[in-house]
C-alpha cells in the first residue's frame, strides 16, 4: 500500500515544518513501512545547522523514522484516530551526513508489541548507504 502526503496527514498529526515523511511506498499496518524524506535546501533547520555546511540534524533523521513508525502503527484498525508517542531510542548509530539534495529512504519494522507499546527497528539510507540506524520505543495514546 502506498500513501501520498494527504493520506499521511490523515494518519499522523504532524504538519509543516515538522512533518518529515513525504511519501510512503510500502505499508503493512502494524508490521513495517518504507517511506521517503526529500531533503532540500529550503528546510528550516539548515539556517542554523550549519550555515556554511548544511547537514540534517541526526535527531530529525530519527524523528522521520519515528513518524514512519507512527504511520505503520496508526494504520492498524485498533489504533486509527489515536496518537503515537516517542518512548525512547536505543542503539542509535549515525553513519553519514544527510545534506540538501539527498533522498532519505526510511524503513521501520515493528519487532515487538505489548498492548499499546512496542519497539521498532529502523534504518535510514541515502543511495543505499546507511545514514542512521536505531531502535525506537513508542506508546500509542488516546
Curated annotation (Swiss-Prot):
NCBIfam families: fabZ (TIGR01750), PRK00006.1 (NF000582)
Reaction catalysis annotation: a (3R)-hydroxyacyl-[ACP] = a (2E)-enoyl-[ACP] + H2O
GO terms, biological process: fatty acid biosynthetic process; lipid A biosynthetic process
Subcellular location: Cytoplasm
Example GO molecular function: (3R)-hydroxyacyl-[acyl-carrier-protein] dehydratase activity
CDD domains, per the entry: FabZ (cd01288)
Source organism of the structure: Clostridium novyi (strain NT)
Function statement: Involved in unsaturated fatty acids biosynthesis. Catalyzes the dehydration of short chain beta-hydroxyacyl-ACPs and long chain saturated and unsaturated beta-hydroxyacyl-ACPs.
Pfam families: FabA
The keyword Cytoplasm is annotated on this UniProt entry: yes
E.C. code: 4.2.1.59
Stated name of the protein: 3-hydroxyacyl-[acyl-carrier-protein] dehydratase FabZ
GO cellular component: cytoplasm; membrane
Keyword list, A-Z: Cytoplasm, Lipid A biosynthesis, Lipid biosynthesis, Lipid metabolism, Lyase
InterPro entries reported for this sequence: FabA_FabZ (IPR013114), FabZ (IPR010084), HotDog_dom_sf (IPR029069)
Main location as per UniProt: cytoplasm
Homology family: Belongs to the thioester dehydratase family. FabZ subfamily.
Catalytic machinery residues: 49
